[in-house]
Design a protein with these regions (language model features):
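N-terminal FAD-binding dinucleotide-binding subdomain shared by FAD-dependent oxidases/monooxygenases
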Residues: 3-223
């Protein structure tokens, strides 16, 4: 049995991970130069099939169709952020995206009370806090062996020898997993094969493609 003690809801979008077909691999490899060029011009630094239209210039039907395509058909993940060109610049466009995802949460989570706990509040604009990317995250809360506790409504008061107590009552637990996050920006001593560290490697300047990045986005850096 799993009990999730939930504080603040963030937006989560489906990863849509799937095996790459030979046709997909061939298409990507045939367009490496084009994808690199598009990535250099993208605000994210990577090619995410951006839509150049505003969310305000299309009909409600076309807007919903584009969001659905990003949610299920465009590879999922961060591609939701590129559904329209003004999601992170126009409050109304952003609200459309946020309302779409909240609608997906309410449609997926069968218990209305759980769904509302999992819905990000209106004071969190879509995409302004790093998106979570998941595989069946919201569906998990439909399982009989998964409970959800809102610790904003019922704060944790103490850890006991047998579990955890909130203002609502005591929860018997075998294991407590602390989801307190991690420090992604703390300096780390990274050495090259010849034992030189990063400051030494940058003595004569730094060369990169489009910018610098570290932490959890470091994998996107070009050498």
């Amino acid at each position: 049995h799993l009990t999730v003690f939930h504080r603040t809801a963030n937006f989560s979008v489906p990863a849509q991970n799937e095996p790459l077909t030979e046709a997909t691999l061939a298409h990507v490899k045939a367009h490496y130069a084009e994808r690199r060029a598009l990535g250099r011009e993208a605000v994210t630094g990577v090619f995410l099939s951006a839509n150049d239209k505003s969310a305000l210039e299309v009909s409600d039907e076309d807007r919903l169709k584009e969001f659905e395509f990003r949610w299920r058909g465009a590879g999922g993940g961060f591609r939701m952020l590129r559904a329209f060109n003004d999601l992170l610049r126009n409050p109304i466009a952003n609200q459309y995206a946020g309302d779409f995802v909240r609608g997906k949460i309410r449609a997926t989570v069968k218990d209305p009370a759980k769904a509302e706990i999992l819905c990000p509040k209106p004071d969190l604009p879509f995409g302004t806090k790093r998106l979570c990317v998941d595989t069946h995250y919201y569906e998990t809360f439909n399982r009989d062996n998964v409970d959800l506790v809102d610790v904003k409504a019922h704060p944790i008061t103490e850890i006991t020898p047998t579990g955890l107590r909130t203002t609502q009552g005591h929860h018997e637990l075998d294991v407590i997993v602390f989801a307190t996050g991690f420090d992604a920006h703390q300096a780390e001593r990274i050495e090259a094969f010849d034992a030189r560290n990063l400051p030494q490697l940058g003595t004569h300047g730094i060369r990169q493609v489009g910018g610098q990045a570290g932490g959890h986005v470091g994998r996107h850096c070009a050498q």
